[in-house]
């Protein structure tokens, strides 16, 4: 089955795996998805990620993170910019997620960045998703 929005598919797979308390989730590979996984790891939302396989069978394996009592590190994932409705923001208009407790992931001219990095570098871009 063809996926019209690969980023939304990635976020949905992660959301479903977290709700089902899975240890890891496998996602079809793309460069943008690897960058999103990198940001999720840097921000402490996932334990680790790895790219497995080669060629068209390449996959991203994301190890999910839970607290000592099984509480989820990711409580919410929300897709903002979609293929049918793109959302772009200037540097001064980049939204704060839960007053800074969450993170917005943006696609900018300088690569895939968090809202904090984009503000610091003075760039705007397409708001891909919110993570909290």
From Swiss-Prot:
InterPro entries associated with the record: Ribosomal_uS8, Ribosomal_uS8_CS, Ribosomal_uS8_sf
UniProt record, GO biological process: translation
The UniProt record lists the keyword Ribonucleoprotein: yes
UniProt keyword terms in alphabetical order: Ribonucleoprotein, Ribosomal protein, RNA-binding, rRNA-binding
GO MF annotations in UniProt: rRNA binding; structural constituent of ribosome
An example Gene Ontology CC term for this record: ribonucleoprotein complex
Subunit: Part of the 30S ribosomal subunit. Contacts proteins S5 and S12.
Task performed by this protein: One of the primary rRNA binding proteins, it binds directly to 16S rRNA central domain where it helps coordinate assembly of the platform of the 30S subunit.
PANTHER family (alphabetical): 40S RIBOSOMAL PROTEIN S15A
NCBIfam families noted in UniProt: PRK00136.1
Family stated for the protein in its record: Belongs to the universal ribosomal protein uS8 family.
Annotated protein name in UniProt: Small ribosomal subunit protein uS8
Native organism: Rubrobacter xylanophilus (strain DSM 9941 / JCM 11954 / NBRC 16129 / PRD-1)
């Amino acid at each position: 089955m063809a996926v019209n929005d690969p980023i939304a598919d990635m976020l949905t797979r992660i959301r479903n795996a977290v709700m089902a308390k899975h240890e890891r989730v496998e996602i079809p590979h793309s460069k943008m998805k690897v960058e999103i996984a990198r940001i999720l790891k840097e921000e402490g939302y996932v334990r680790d990620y790895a790219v497995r396989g080669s060629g068209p069978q390449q996959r991203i394996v994301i190890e999910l993170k839970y607290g000592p009592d099984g509480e989820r590190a990711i409580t919410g994932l929300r897709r903002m910019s979609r293929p049918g409705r793109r959302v772009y923001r200037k540097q001064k208009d980049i939204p704060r997620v839960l007053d800074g407790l969450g993170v917005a992931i943006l696609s900018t001219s300088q690569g895939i960045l968090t809202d904090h990095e984009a503000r610091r570098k003075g760039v705007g871009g397409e708001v891909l998703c919110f993570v909290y």
